Amino acid sequence: MNTMIKILLIALAGLCACIAAQSAEPRAFGWKPDVGGVVDKAFGPRFRGATIKESVDLRAKMPPVYDQGAIGSCVSQGVGVALDYAHVKSNPGLKFFTPSRLFIYFQGRVAIGTVNQDSGCQIRDAIAATQKLGAPLESLWPYRESKFKAKPPTAAYSDALKRQIIQAYKAETLDDVKRALSLDLPVVFGVPVYRSIMDLSWFNYTLPMPAKNERSVGGHAMVVVGYRNSDSMLIVRNSWSSNWGRSGHMLMPFEYWNKFQRQTDAWVISVAE
């Protein structure tokens, strides 16, 4: 066996081991469907004049992909990265700061009285809390899964006020999502997901449509960071680390979005201090 074949076999073995380890990692969800509230500014009427581009890809402009681990903090991961992105976009010259996702997750559960449970939360509650309280630096309340029940320290609350969401809008249609992305604004959304989402990899990172009579395994919040009209795909960022999917991302068919549009809960954070 020549040297090149040996190298290829070793690389293939390493890839298989990586895929096996990836599939064995715990996966958590945590999105609670929207039940209505006071944070309701519709995106469509305010930005109807925005031109929808043929394609958009914001991946290179976003902070590194987060990892929620084994707790249901997906909403705080999505709102956190959207806040970080909007903060930098609204303040040219600043760098990404990485908000405390554990802080956002705690405040999102305060609204529903479940701070002692790993209950997940609604996107609107996490946004409303971040409008009121802001989000501190990750270093002031680090992401330690075992600490999800603990109230953040006073210093975290003081620092959080430096970074607040100023404007957030509800995106109600796929065209709303495309218009937001055409304005370089990512979209945080929650949707029912199925077992197949846990099996995506570098080589297979397109989310399949659920089979007939297949049951959802939960609700999950993610972030749309692009789309392609050419093959009717959304580019979606997850919070299961960069080892999942293709560097932490997947492709979601427009068909999937349209199928669940009435259940999908989507938000655009356009301005942050």
Where are these regions (language model features)?
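Predominantly the structural core of cysteine protease catalytic domains
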Residues: S23-F29, K41-P45, G49-E54, G80-D84, ...
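Active-site-surrounding "flap" and adjacent substrate/cofactor-binding loops of secreted or lumenal enzymes
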Residues: A82-G113
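A short glycine/serine-rich beta->alpha loop
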Residues: A60-I71, I112-V115
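Active-site alpha-helical elements of protease catalytic centers
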Residues: A70-A86
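General secretory precursor processing signal
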Residues: I19-A21, Q77
